[in-house]
Amino acid sequence: MLQQTQVERVIEKYQRFISAFPDFSSLSQASLHDILSIWQGLGYNRRAIALKQIAHEVITKYDGILPFSADILIQLPGIGKATASAIAAFAFNQPVVFIETNVRRVFIHFFFQDRDNVKDSELLPLIERALDQDNPRQWYYALMDYGVMLKKEFGNANRKSFHYQRQAPFQGSQRQLRGLVLKTVLQAPKVTETTIIKKLKKEPKKIKETLKQLQMEGFIRKERNTYSIA
């Protein structure tokens, strides 16, 4: 949930999500409709589909127990290197090296104040040397909190990163339209394309294209003239 979503928005949703799906078994058996209904408001809805797929794989391949190895975790749907390493560090207290936005900010602030276009490959050896091998979980917790403080006090040092990208405005974006269309489909057992267009009052061509995308990605299904959650 914390991938590209602020902590303040995640906390409430996390509590509801865990209450509804307390284990991998309940999550794997849940309908996509129920999962997406709780997920609404977090954005990046592909993560919700990935979580359901992950739960299914953990049940079928790993006897319901999440693997602790980052090398195995990275093979699960929607899990990249940084997320796999973060799970290994935070859930299993393993001394793995990874970079997230606050970790990056700390090391750029202290070691690259006079540089621009700093690559993560330059940061990784420094992080590896500094990492607390005995208690990596607490070390990363502290580092991430410290990164938040640095941003408040000194601005965003991550602008010096080679990988820095300013996030495009959400208002009026395709991301926003996808969320609105998906929310509309969630609100009724079945809904027609015409109803969606009338309700959202957006450009019909863009809505039709968005419906096709969501259908191709496994979010919704089309039966005759109506759409519903897959």
What are these regions (language model features)?
Residues Q215-Y227:
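A short, conserved structural fragment
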Residues K201-Q215:
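Short amphipathic alpha-helical interaction segments
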Residues I87, E209-Q213, S228-A230:
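Residues in the recognition helix of alpha-helical DNA-binding motifs
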Residues L2-Q176, A188-T195, K199-K205:
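Catalytic cores of DNA base-excision repair glycosylases
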Residues V185, Y227-S228:
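C-terminal non-catalytic scaffold/interaction domains in large multidomain proteins
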Residues R178-V185:
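Hydrophobic residues on short alpha-helical segments
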Residues I108, L186, K212, M216:
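Residue-level detection of the helix-turn-helix DNA-binding "recognition helix"
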